Amino acid sequence: MPLSKNVIEKISIETIRVLKSRFDTISDEDIKIRNMPFHMAFLRAFYGKIGINDDTEALKFLTLSQWFHGLSTTLGQSYFENIAHILSNGEKRTFKNYKIKRSVRDKISEIINDLKSGERLPNVEKENKELREATSKNSEYVNGLEFTADVYFEDKDKVVMIELKTVRPNAGEMRGEKQKILYGKAYMMETKPNKKVYYFIGFPYDPTENPENPCGYDKDRFMSSLIEFSKYFDKREVLIAEELWSFLSGEENTMKKILDIINSIAKPDFKEKFDFINTFPFINQDRLYTKDAIDEQKFKKYMDILQEWRLYSEIECAKAVKELSLLKLSSRDRRTFERLINNSMFSNNNKYNENRKMKILELYNKYMQK
């Protein structure tokens, strides 16, 4: 079953937002070749290793690396998380100032210490059983460890939480991540005792996979590439690459579909197309409400871009604008319509202007019902 048009459009909008924000943060000054003598001095030792031929290529490499770092930060801090929420109908949720039983806290400390010392191997089923038993004991309550689930969603019979990580997490942070996950599961087990509780750690792609197979993954290989990861985590509590994205959506091949959406938008002419569709360029505003209100050639170009970028509801909005531009509107509705068509699809801070679309469609439906 394919992703719904609504989900696809939301992914497209999020992709456009990220691309536009990256264009906004890279000035002509940022892409100039800069003087970096110390970086260059060290980098020359690696020319053969990374396939750089000369200093000119090296300076371009350093400049691109700085920009790429910013893109990686944007993807890790917002894009992956927002796409996960779109696919799962979930949200980010923080838990603090809560209480757990002392017996639970002691059990978590025991599990963590045993994993650290190597006295036990990670086993998610055994750990869950021990946590359930600890929550059922008669024990005083103590403060729990604050935690945030990057993705949280809840069904009738289960609670699912996911910690989204970069594919190269910092060495030494695995112990803390495991501890946080155990606290999160224990708290949910006590507050929602009749529901199954899952807390995964998720990675958006597998960097150890062959680039010719971007959606593929080898969980064992990936886990072994991270310092102390297998020491604390059972592979059953890890979601990676296609496995993660399809789990979130409930549909197969979701990662490929996400990449297809990105690839349809992220092209060299992105900025040119964005600037064209961000307003309604096909309207001849000095000829509104006449047969010459629409520039048909520009309208076709506008619609082609919306179709290519999978902005399905904006296609309906554009059709409504075309119809309304030819109608005899009341003076009050004219004022509303004229203000709406001078709004942008994306604001200066790159926020999608859904209100513009909704108000235009509302006005259109009002006249179509007459």
UniProtKB/Swiss-Prot annotation:
Transmembrane segments: none annotated. Its EC number is 3.1.21.4. GO terms for biological process: DNA restriction-modification system. It comes from the Archaea. InterPro entries: Restrct_endonuc_II_TdeIII (IPR019045). Keywords: DNA-binding, Endonuclease, Hydrolase, Nuclease, Restriction system. The keyword Phosphoprotein does not apply. It catalyses: Endonucleolytic cleavage of DNA to give specific double-stranded fragments with terminal 5'-phosphates. The keyword DNA-binding applies. GO terms for molecular function: DNA binding; type II site-specific deoxyribonuclease activity. A P subtype restriction enzyme that recognizes the double-stranded sequence 5'-GGNCC-3'; the cleavage site is unknown. Belongs to the TdeIII type II restriction endonuclease family. This is Type II restriction enzyme MjaII. The lineage of its organism: Archaea, Methanobacteriati, Methanobacteriota, Methanomada group, Methanococci.
